[in-house]
Curated annotation (Swiss-Prot):
It catalyses: guanosine(527) in 16S rRNA + S-adenosyl-L-methionine = N(7)-methylguanosine(527) in 16S rRNA + S-adenosyl-L-homocysteine. Its EC number is 2.1.1.170. It is found in: Cytoplasm. One of its GO terms (molecular function) is rRNA (guanine-N7-)-methyltransferase activity. This is Ribosomal RNA small subunit methyltransferase G. Specifically methylates the N7 position of guanine in position 527 of 16S rRNA. S-adenosyl-L-methionine binds at residues 73, 78, 124-125, 139.
Amino acid sequence: MLQRLNCLLMQAGIVITDTQKTQLVQLVELLHKWNKAYNLTSVRDPDAMLVKHILDSLVVSPHLHGERFIDVGTGPGLPGLPLAIINPDKQFVLLDSLGKRINFIRQVIQVLGLTNVTPVKSRVEEYQPDVGFDCVLSRAFASLEDMLSWCHHLPSEQGSFLALKGQYPEQELAQLPANIRLVACHELRVPELEGERHLLEFKHIQPE
């Protein structure tokens, strides 16, 4: 699997350490093992997990600005865990309301020795951080309108929202609230993944 990961990383132009590569392989092995009992993802094949979960998360990394991030509706830690593995200098809170997902993330943290990940079991609208985050991450979580509404209290004053989407969500963007601005849209290329991937960045419009 390590050889396969190396090939995908090369295609994506992503350079990481050997230790980080080993940790990513361990993550896939743990996800594959837990998935048999706890049904954490519909992707069953470890090889497909490398593309659809690991690489699909890693391509977001160049667009992470700041030090403190929250991954809302993280599921089994995606994209939070892969991003935390290759960004050990950044802090990640992984939020989900399902206990089995948070238990899996805790196991990954323990096995991989991650010190920059904090799992939190909570509904996003009920979670109240002491300090706002530099960025709120979302992948396959909800519609843009719901995500921005439920997470409005999470970023700092200068913080942003990053939403990972498939096709460009023209219809969803037309329904954005007036106090939210789309500041960037990045087309992402994920090796061997069919279909479009877009990363949309939003910010609150500060009242003058």
